[in-house]
A protein has these predicted regions:
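Transmembrane signal-anchor hairpin modules in multi-pass inner-membrane enzymes, especially those
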Residues: 1-121, 163, 202-204, 251-263, ...
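Loop-to-helix entry and N-terminal half of a specific, functionally important transmembrane alpha helix
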Residues: 9-17, 263-272, 313, 427, ...
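Transmembrane alpha-helices of multi-pass inner-membrane enzymes
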Residues: 14, 18, 46-51, 243-245, ...
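Juxtamembrane membrane-water interface segments that cap and precede transmembrane helices
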Residues: 22-31, 118-130, 212-229, 418-434
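Transmembrane alpha-helical segments and their membrane-water interfaces
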Residues: 46-60, 102-189
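A membrane-periplasm/extracellular boundary helix in multi-pass inner-membrane enzymes
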Residues: 88, 181, 187-194, 299-359, ...
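Alpha-helical transmembrane segments of multi-pass inner-membrane proteins
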Residues: 140-153, 166-302, 460, 485-489
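Long extracytoplasmic/lumenal interhelical loops at the membrane interface
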Residues: 358-373, 377, 381, 385-440
Length: 534
């Protein structure tokens, strides 16, 4: 594969992870499936095309094809059996046929074509087949863009993994530049600068969709919460699951010789933490707290006085960013800035964003936990295979309790389902793992998590190996990958991990780091040696 084309595609893929809800008119819905909202689909499709052409001509780019094919067959096979089981037990075909026509726009065309061919089949039987094909395509595309995307990265850089990390660093740096530049405009908007407001009104429709879901999401403007290029402040938590490990790892294990370089690292950390606090959203704030706890655990396990010192500096910078965020919020609300008021607002911020996480009646928790419990009940009713990929929404009325249906957001979701139709409704669990459990059962959840669990253990072994050999270059990469991958998976407890495509990039880099070719060329961050017998 042409290395320049490969590098440009990978650079665009890494840089574009901030664009996770692109406008409808540029989406590739048929080819993108559930990932069509991500800009990452474009570089991925280019990568698939170039890889396919190169493989056809030279046959030397795909690595470990048998193992990947075996896993793909198992993954698709289990989810397909789950889907067949779900279609067999599905009790809502009549509701679909009697519901809005917009949810089955292509079905009349199928019926008309079959009629012309002289095949007069029962409409409900055709609906079953049509739904089966539709959701089987979803399963295939889901695998291609998730694990398939990670596999492409592994294959592209199998013989030159240090190049992959260099391009990744450049791409993430570009994404940060976009994130901060757009965030600056949004901060000016939050501070009531009219020119910033008018600028966002012009640009936002080109960045993400506007009020397409439930008639109100994503908002045209976010008047009280920072969100930068993302459609939802909570999505920043998924992005920061990569950015915070990226920055803090460089602070702890990177080159500390130049003061200007160190100042740049701490400035990036300050701005990243500040943006998290300005979201006033629980997901990114809880993620930041969790990542700091995880970082401390790693440092205590591999204790070094120097690392602990860096950790204290990191906490100090985050603390300063927290105080600055309170000052900014006070300024934008024209509040008094006395010490008593500042302490009050600090306590209120912590209570609203951290203290309410376990409360069932604070902020949107009632609706969130209602959907979570509904999916748990649904999964427990079919624990082995679930109800089938994409079929869970129809069960909402039967599995939500009367009390849960009274929450405002739940009522809006159910009303939207009646209006748009069952097949156009999502009603997700807002939790990656509970959602997969209800959709695909325990088997589907296991086959999904297996690669993550496997590579996390291998990364831990590699980290131990690098630590005992005092290999600072390798240690930096091993630490970042393990730290970031665990953080990305942790984000799945409050939202889907694929909200930001970065998790699949990190997964691909993790397999590349452990199983990539052990070349000895000089690396900008070290000389990767891999694990013996990896």
């Amino acid at each position: 594969m042409n290395s320049k084309i490969r590098d440009y595609i990978f650079l665009i893929l890494c840089a574009s992870i901030v664009f996770n809800e692109i406008p409808n008119n540029i989406r590739l819905n048929f080819l993108g499936g559930e990932y069509s909202n991500l800009f990452a689909v474009y570089p991925l499709l280019l990568g698939i095309a170039f890889t396919g052409i190169w493989q056809y001509k030279n046959g030397n780019i795909l690595i470990a094809k048998e193992k990947m094919s075996c896993y793909g067959i198992i993954y698709v096979g289990i989810l397909s059996v789950s889907l067949i089981h779900g279609l067999f037990i599905y009790p809502y075909y009549t509701e679909i046929l009697n519901g809005p026509v917009s949810q089955i726009q292509k079905l009349p065309l199928v019926l008309s074509l079959l009629s012309k061919l002289g095949l007069n089949l029962d409409t409900s039987h055709i609906l079953v087949g049509w739904m089966g094909i539709r959701f089987f395509k979803t399963i295939i595309l889901d695998f291609i863009y998730s694990f398939g995307g990670a596999y492409l990265i592994f294959c592209w850089y199998y013989k030159n993994k240090e190049r992959a990390f260099k391009i990744f660093s450049e791409g993430i740096s570009i994404s940060l530049g976009i994130y901060f530049f757009y965030g600056l405009v949004e901060c000016l908007y939050l501070a009531h600068f009219r020119i910033a407001t008018e600028t966002l009104k012009i640009i936002n429709p080109f960045i993400h969709t506007i009020e397409v879901s439930h008639g109100w999401w994503p908002k045209y403007l976010s008047p009280d919460q920072f969100r930068s290029v993302f459609p939802e402040p909570s999505h920043i938590g998924n992005y920061m699951a990569i950015i915070i490990p990226f920055i803090t790892t460089d602070i702890i294990y990177g080159d500390t010789g130049k003061k200007r370089t160190n100042a740049k690292k701490y400035l990036l950390l300050f701005l990243s933490a500040l943006s998290i606090f300005l979201t006033k959203a629980r997901t990114p704030n809880a993620m930041l707290l969790g990542m700091m706890i995880l970082l401390l655990l790693f440092i205590l396990i591999h204790f070094k006085k120097e690392s602990l010192k860096h950790f204290i500096y990191i906490l100090c910078v985050i603390g300063i960013s927290f105080l600055c965020s309170l000052g900014f919020m006070n300024f934008t609300k024209n509040r008094e800035t006395s010490i008593d008021k500042s302490v009050y607002h600090a306590n209120k911020f912590i209570e609203d964003n951290i203290g309410t996480l376990a409360s069932d009646n604070k902020r949107s928790n009632g609706a969130r936990y209602s959907m979570l419990r509904y999916h748990v009940r649904l999964g427990l009713s079919h624990p082995i295979l679930g109800v089938g990929k994409g079929l869970h929404a129809a069960y909402a009325n039967d599995y939500l309790t009367d009390k849960e249906k009274k929450y405002r957001e739940v009522r809006l979701w159910l009303d939207d389902q009646k209006k748009e139709g069952i097949l156009k409704s999502n009603l997700g669990a807002l939790n990656e793992y509970v959602g997969r459990f209800s959709d695909t059962g325990i088997l589907g959840l296991i086959v999904f998590l297996s690669p993550f669990i496997w590579i996390i253990f291998r990364l831990w072994e590699k980290l131990q190996f690098d630590f005992h050999n005092d290999d600072q270059g390798n240690l930096k990469i091993s630490f970042f990958l393990l730290y970031s991958l665990i953080s990305c998976l942790a984000s799945g407890f409050n939202i889907l991990i694929s909200v930001v495509y970065g998790v699949w990039v990190v997964l691909g880099l993790s397999f590349l780091w452990i199983y990539g070719s052990k070349n000895k060329s000089k690396n900008v961050v070290g000389k990767p040696k891999g694990i013996e017998n990896a």
